[in-house]
Amino acid sequence: GLLDIVTGLLGNLIVDVLKPKTPAS
């Protein structure tokens, strides 16, 4: 559902914050 999409986007943002050295695909 929409909530799943929102949580997915938030998860990606958190990963980007925790792993800033990871190159964006």
Swiss-Prot record:
Top-level taxon in the UniProt lineage: Eukaryota
Entry annotated with the keyword Hydrolase: no
Keywords for this protein: Amphibian defense peptide, Secreted
A biological process term (GO) from this entry: defense response
Tissue: Expressed by the skin dorsal glands.
UniProt-annotated location(s): Secreted
Predominant subcellular localization, coarse grouping: secreted
Coiled coil location: none
Cellular component annotations (GO), alphabetically ordered: extracellular region
Secreted as UniProt keyword: yes
Pfam families assigned to the protein according to its UniProt record, in alphabetical order: Antimicrobial24
Function: Has no antimicrobial or anticancer activity.
Record family assignment: Belongs to the frog skin active peptide (FSAP) family. Aurein subfamily.
Protein name: Aurein-5.1
Organism (species): Ranoidea raniformis (Southern bell frog)
